[in-house]
Design a protein with these regions (language model features):
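Conserved Walker B catalytic segment
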Residues: 128-200, 208-210
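Short, conserved phosphate/pyrophosphate- and ester-handling motifs at nucleotide-, phospho-/glycolipid
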Residues: 22, 50, 261
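Helix-loop-helix "sensor" segment of P-loop NTPases
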Residues: 205-256
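AAA+/P-loop NTPase substrate/partner-engagement loops
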Residues: 62-84
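The conserved phosphate-sensing helix
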Residues: 258-266
Length: 266
């Protein structure tokens, strides 16, 4: 069997053996998710917050939690956000809770009925909403989509975690969206809302400004660099997997240079 020649994986999510420690953060965030606690995770880009949340998601799913992910960086408009929420609700929630023919019934109460398409290659469903309808119709439709995770959690007696990546983008999509989201999310005790973002100043304004709808609505977790002692063991293990041990002096010099920054170290 061939062994890997590169000890590290970078430029993509660090999963399985590529994930670097952070067991304290994993345990804390997992506990919050299991208890329905809303959390905002602060970290600069390339600090591993997405990999951390994926690790927590895997463990939460193993404990029967339904986990749904939406990346707001891919939803520049309200219409696209509604489409993405519909896709996520179908793929991450309804697909687990219902048989195939029953899944689309989840969307029967929407103001705008979604247009459903099927990717001929993957079989994945896509959702779109008629952009020609009145803006208020789209707003009502999106609000109803935001309500669905909580409704499904209550009706099926399941815990749900809704992960919203790059959450600071919500303000650019529509300045009124934080009000709509907050009014819905505060009525969903069965749902743990996990907010991720890389623009700290924007997230701090959203969650720490008393004039904002999300003021003090979520526990705050900051992801920092990885302690050298923890990183050192990980580096040694990764090199050992390739059959090429690394000298301790080399590892020390690298960590002195990167100061434990995850991406820079790898």
């Amino acid at each position: 069997m061939a062994v890997a020649t590169n000890p590290f994986r970078y430029g993509a999510l660090a999963l399985d053996d590529a994930f670097t420690d952070r067991e304290t953060e994993v345990a804390s965030l997992l506990s919050d998710v299991l208890n329905g606690q809303d959390v905002v995770v602060f970290a600069p880009r390339r600090y591993g917050k997405s990999s951390l949340v994926w690790r927590v998601s895997e463990r939460a799913i193993a404990q029967d939690v339904l986990v749904a992910h939406v990346n707001l960086m891919t939803t520049p408009t309200t219409e696209r956000l509604a489409e993405k929420f519909a896709e996520t609700i179908h793929d991450d929630l309804a697909s687990t809770l219902f048989r195939t023919r029953e899944r689309l019934r989840v969307f029967s109460g929407l103001r705008i009925t979604p247009i459903v398409t099927v990717d001929p290659t993957t079989g994945k469903l896509g959702f779109s909403f008629d952009a020609g309808r009145q803006p208020q119709d789209l707003d009502v439709t999106l609000e109803r989509l935001l309500e669905l995770p909580g409704q499904l959690a209550a009706e099926r007696e399941r815990k749900v975690a809704l992960v919203l990546a790059e959450f600071q983008e919500i303000v650019d999509i529509d300045p009124e969206l934080p009000k709509i989201m907050r009014s819905v999310f505060e009525t969903q005790p069965e749902v743990a809302h996990v907010y991720l973002g890389s623009k700290r100043h924007m997230l701090e304004r959203i969650f720490n400004d008393e004039n904002e709808p999300f003021w003090r609505s979520a526990k705050q977790m900051e992801i920092g660099v990885i302690a050298p002692d923890l990183f050192r063991g990980y580096i040694d293990a990764q090199f050992s997997r390739t059959g090429r041990p690394v000298e301790a002096e080399v590892v020390d010099r690298v960590l002195e240079t990167t100061l434990g920054h995850p991406y820079a170290t790898k």
